[in-house]
UniProtKB/Swiss-Prot annotation:
Gene Ontology terms, MF aspect: magnesium ion binding; phosphopyruvate hydratase activity
Protein name: Enolase
Active site feature: 205, 337
GO cellular component: cell surface; extracellular region; phosphopyruvate hydratase complex
Binding site for Mg(2+): 242, 285, 312
Superkingdom: Bacteria
Cofactor requirement: Mg(2+)
Residues binding (2R)-2-phosphoglycerate, per UniProt: 163, 337, 366-367, 388
One BP term from GO: glycolytic process
Listed EC numbers: 4.2.1.11
Amino acid sequence: MSSIVDVIAREILDSRGNPTVEADVLLESGVMGRAAVPSGASTGTREAIELRDGDASRYLGKGVMQAVENVNTEISEAIIGLDAQEQAFIDQTMIDLDGTDNKSRLGANAILAVSMAVAKAAAEESGLPLYRYFGGMSPMQMPVPMMNIINGGEHANNSLDIQEFMVMPVGAANIREAIRCGAEIFHALKKLLNKKGHSTAVGDEGGFAPNLGSHAEALQIIMEAIEIAGYVPGQDVLLALDCAASEFYKDGKYKLAGEGLELTSAQFVDYLANLADQFPIVSIEDGMSEADWDGWKLLTDRLGDKVQIVGDDIFVTNTKIFKEGIKKGIGNSILIKINQIGTLSETFAAVEMAKRAGYTAVISHRSGETEDSTIADIAVGLNAGQIKTGSLSRSDRIAKYNQLIRIEEDLGDTASYPGRETFYNLR
């Protein structure tokens, strides 16, 4: 009864008003799975390729009707009749059908929409919540959230070069209290920014985007907001950064235009180490450019014992690239973005590789999101331990937090919240 009988895709809009792909997978039993794919702003050069139409007369060339057509024709024909429970086989069927290394023929956005919808349909058919379908009956751990409350870089039109300034409520007793903590800090920060005469406009991921003089000033304001909200920085709440350093790495230098700095790899490592000395920073994502593997090694050697060094653009959720990074001692954590690789099976393989290598895994959204909350179920089902899904505003971000609250309620007393223990590989 779990045979696929129909696959339908459509063009919908993401949180930035850009087109994306949504797919429905219908099973013989009558159940349906529906999924929509996200899209990134700062992207790794080796990510799987999302297919855009390039027709300037529609959506400024960003339409996805060709990807939709690929789902409704080639992909549909290839997987109708297959058992939705056979996720890996279906994913491999689509990979083989595409025939490229980066899913550029059919589009990673087309393939991923179907991959996710198949899983949702199979879970529904099994009578299991999605997180249980992913993780089985083993004990479930709720993820510690990375909450992006100040935006810079490609996510905001301001003077900050570092892309995300985040809080992590490690002192909370459960995910519900962690989300409350983040929300209270978010509102305290809004009042504080207003008081200081800064803009409270928000960026793509719902964080504030004030024009501040330096990254240290942004971190200091967050520290103040944490205290105003009634929490203790460094105890209840830790800080995290996503530098997205590839975006300001030019001609072999890290060019921090907002601070008028042009730094070598070693100097930028010193810069980040200085911030980590001044503030309770527990995680730095993409601290170096994806093109600067030597810089990554410097950063890992300098801070990797006490700070989570997360690879996003450098690893792009790709096990072949990630395996190379592990061998070279690059980072100690991987960011997991489902649309970077384009199928759930490959995503899950990257998480498993991280666990075997002693790396942490952070399940992540993209800056262009939808109401789809699949990543919340992935974070819990795979016991990833961490999730990064934006700020405490914009319903595309809140959808994931609300799903985590529902999952924790469903799990009851069996749900654990790791807090600081999520950083098991730090000293």
